Each structure stands twice: as structure tokens, then as C-alpha cells.
Amino acid sequence: MKNSTYLIILLALGLLFTTYKWVSAPETAAVNVENTTINDIMTRTSVRSYSGEAVKKVTVDTLLRAAMAAPTAGNKQPWRFVVVNNRQTLRTIGEEFGSMKMAAEAPVAVIMCGEPAATFPGEGVGYWIQDVSAATENLLLAAHAMGLGAVWCGIYPIQERVDKFRSLLSLPEDIIPMACVCVGYPDGESTPKDKWNPEYIHYNKWHSPTE
Ligand SMILES: Cc1cc2nc3c(=O)[nH]c(=O)nc-3n(C[C@H](O)[C@H](O)[C@H](O)COP(=O)(O)O)c2cc1C
């Protein structure tokens, strides 16, 4: 065989291999749990039961750094945080709100707040909720990645909860408490929920089930 024939066969094989890799790549990416970030996202779950182990200030600082690394509309950063490690205050939160019982046993809770006046005026003011939500998810993921367990407990938009937290933490009127994130070392294993549902996905336009 001529050298040029060998070269053509080699090129064809190379092309075949590249095409195979390219076609199979999205499948591989979808289930790639080798990647630590993807793995942490897929294995995070709400943790509502904690061991007695304390959470160090340096660890809380890392959680807050992760929260403040979140995307934020116009880089306005309207998020504000109140770290609660006072036992009595945590107990009060746990007793006041049925959905936040775990606060009574948590070593620490971070109250994720927003200052709407710090973001865009007018219609854009609602971005504060998205910004504080992005920060909250970052904090949850950081906690999980560091071996902690956490749960997002909703405050805003339930007015009664907003008022109670405002009074409990002496929040000024222009600061809105959005969520109470209880954090601690998990007391046992929790299984992440599988929420994958391809029916929620539409490509290019919304398709009705009959299409
Ligand atoms: C806006 C919001 C409010 C929530 N409020 C509470 C709450 O008050 N108490 C609670 O135990 N969990 C609360 N959760 C956690 C959800 O129950 C939890 O995320 C959901 O059941 C899915 O489970 P997973 O986080 O383990 O994936 C809240 C979550 C979100 C996003």
C-alpha cells in the first residue's frame, strides 16, 4: 500500500474517533459524577438533624464567602446576613415556627436577608430575591461540600414570619429576612432526592404533551 493510502486510513480513523467522542459527550456529561462540583450539586439534600458538633467561625466565614460569590444583578449585591449562634435565639426560632423546628438543635443558622434599596429601582427591585436566593444555594452547596448539612427555611414572602424575624433580630425596616438556613454536622446519612424529570424540558419553544 502507498504511504498516501495509509495516511488516508489514519485520517479517516481519526475523524471517526473524534465524531464518536463528540456525539457521546453530552451523554457522558449528564451523568458525570466524577466531577466534584457536579457531584456536590447532585448529592446535596436538606439536612434537618445535627450532631452536637460545633461549627467554627472560620467555617461560617467560608460559607458566607461562598454566598457572596453568587451571581447578582448588576453586581449590586443586595444580600445581607445575620449569623445566629445564640442558643436561646435558635431555640426561639425552633419554637416559633413549626417548619423550622430543627433550628432549636442547630449549632448555627444564617438568616439570609435582602436590602431591596441596594438593587435596581423600579421594576428591577425584585431582583433582590433572585440575588439572595442564588447566595442561599451557594451557601447550601458550600456547606454540603464541607461535610456540613443545611436546610433552607423560607421566611419571605410570608409576612407573619418576616415580622417575627424582624422583631427577633432587631432588623431595620429596609432589611427583609428571606430565609433561615440552619447549619450543622449531619446526624446520620440522608439520601438525595432524584428530581430529574425530562417532561419539564422544552427545546426552542413550549411543546404541549400532544405535539
Ligand atoms: C423557598 C424554600 C422554602 C423552604 N422552606 C422550608 C421550611 O420552612 N422547612 C423545611 O424543613 N424545609 C424547607 N425547604 C426545603 C425543602 O423542603 C426542600 O428543599 C425540598 O423538600 C427538596 O428537598 P432537598 O432540599 O433535600 O432536595 C424550603 C426550600 C425552599 C427552596
Language model segments and positions:
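Acidic, surface-exposed loops and disordered segments
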Residues: 2-211
